[in-house]
Amino acid sequence: MTHLERSRHQQHPFHMVMPSPWPIVVSFALLSLALSTALTMHGYIGNMNMVYLALFVLLTSSILWFRDIVAEATYLGDHTMAVRKGINLGFLMFVLSEVLIFAGLFWAYFHSAMSPDVTLGACWPPVGIEAVQPTELPLLNTIILLSSGATVTYSHHALIAGNRNKALSGLLITFWLIVIFVTCQYIEYTNAAFTISDGVYGSVFYAGTGLHFLHMVMLAAMLGVNYWRMRNYHLTAGHHVGYETTIIYTHVLDVIWLFLYVVFYWWGV
């Protein structure tokens, strides 16, 4: 049913979502991914097959779910002004929850760093830990991430001004900057002198930077989807709520990374 036909029968601007299998499928896929990963890490499962299967189901169901959302927003006209306000509010609540998660990780870091136990050598980083230097890859990553914030803002302003070519160029540059950031972060992890199992320092370091790393992978996927949608004329100067939320997400991750860099890489070393 198109938006025009629905308006004859529906006296409110809200989207009455049709029954969909994807929320429950994604929920069970996430549960399976968490359980299989934990069981594999603790040796209860001898291989990674269950992890790969859960990840495949999660990615496939997420793609199909996003496909339906794009169809509802672009072709069916379900995302009215009231719906877009609700989406923006929900995304802001999501961002708040992410900030609180990282606040807990910073709390854990400061709890151990400001009063290191005697078992750690009464110092921070603990005895035997060779910390990552802040003037190496982390500094390059900081420059890359701040640059991505500038290019995505440039793309957004170009889209609002109706300059499609500049909007596409800025978005594409942002996407590749995020890919480079993720690659540099992976190189840093593979060359680090400590692992997540090296005491509280390794645990809290990889928990904080690793969680940010996963969010950056998600951000790269979101930017890629928005680039595809912009190429296909799904985004207009007045209606691009998905792109707006992605831009907010980019800036939030930029700020979180600045705190991670200052605390984990500079102050903590």
UniProtKB/Swiss-Prot annotation:
Its EC number is 7.1.1.9. SUPFAM superfamilies: Cytochrome c oxidase subunit III-like. It catalyses: 4 Fe(II)-[cytochrome c] + O2 + 8 H(+)(in) = 4 Fe(III)-[cytochrome c] + 2 H2O + 4 H(+)(out). It is a multi-pass membrane protein. Residues 42-48, 115-137, 189-201, 266-269 are mitochondrial intermembrane. It comes from Saccharomyces cerevisiae (strain ATCC 204508 / S288c) (Baker's yeast). Belongs to the cytochrome c oxidase subunit 3 family. InterPro entries: Cyt_c/ubiquinol_Oxase_su3, Cyt_c_oxase_su3_dom, Cyt_c_oxidase-like_su3, Cyt_c_oxidase_su3-like_sf, Cyt_c_oxidase_su3_a-hlx. Component of the cytochrome c oxidase (complex IV, CIV), a multisubunit enzyme composed of 12 subunits. The complex is composed of a catalytic core of 3 subunits COX1, COX2 and COX3, encoded in the mitochondrial DNA, and 9 supernumerary subunits COX4, COX5A (or COX5B), COX6, COX7, COX8, COX9, COX12, COX13 and COX26, which are encoded in the nuclear genome. Component of the cytochrome c oxidase, the last enzyme in the mitochondrial electron transport chain which drives oxidative phosphorylation. The respiratory chain contains 3 multisubunit complexes succinate dehydrogenase (complex II, CII), ubiquinol-cytochrome c oxidoreductase (cytochrome b-c1 complex, complex III, CIII) and cytochrome c oxidase (complex IV, CIV), that cooperate to transfer electrons derived from NADH and succinate to molecular oxygen, creating an electrochemical gradient over the inner membrane that drives transmembrane transport and the ATP synthase. GO terms for biological process: aerobic respiration; cellular respiration; mitochondrial electron transport, cytochrome c to oxygen. GO terms for cellular component: mitochondrial inner membrane; mitochondrial membrane; mitochondrion; respiratory chain complex IV. It comes from the Eukaryota. This is Cytochrome c oxidase subunit 3. The keyword Transmembrane helix applies. It is found in: Mitochondrion inner membrane. The gene is COX3. Keywords: Membrane, Mitochondrion, Mitochondrion inner membrane, Translocase, Transmembrane, Transmembrane helix. Residues 1-22, 74-80, 162-164, 231-248 are mitochondrial matrix. The N-terminus is blocked. GO terms for molecular function: cytochrome-c oxidase activity; ubiquinone binding. Pfam families: COX3 (PF00510). Signal peptide: none annotated. The chain crosses the membrane at residues 23-41, 49-73, 81-114, 138-161, 165-188, 202-230, 249-265.
